[in-house]
C-alpha cells in the first residue's frame, strides 16, 4: 500500500491501522522526516516533489511508483485526492477517486451549502456575499468564510 502523503496525523493513523493488520505500507513525502516515518509500521518514505509546488512532478512520481508493480493500491489521504482526479488523464495508473466535478461540489463551501440545501439537510443559515449591499440585514456577529480554505484559515468573525 502506498499513501499519498506522510506528514499528517491522518497518514500516521492510516499507517498504524493498516500496519497492525499486516499491510505493508510506504508513504510519499517531499520532506525528509515526516511523522509517518517514525512509525514501526511504515516500511519506507518515497521522496517525491511537493504537490503544492510541483503538481505535475508529483503526479509523474506517483505514476512511476504505482506502475513499478511494487504497490497494489494507492490511498489518497488529503488534498492529493483532488489532484489525482484533476490529473488522472496524465497518469497511466488509474487512481480510484471521484470525478473532479464531485470534488468541486463538496470542497467549495458555497457549492457544499447549496448541495445541503438541495438535499434539504440542516445547516446554519447562510448567504453569499459578493457586494457591499449583500451585507444589509445581517444579524451580527457573523462568520465570513472564504470559498476554499482549510483548518480554519479563511474564516473571519465580524
Which ranges hold each PLM region?
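Active-site nucleotide/adenylate-binding loops and adjacent lid/helix of ATP-dependent enzymes
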Residues: 103-158
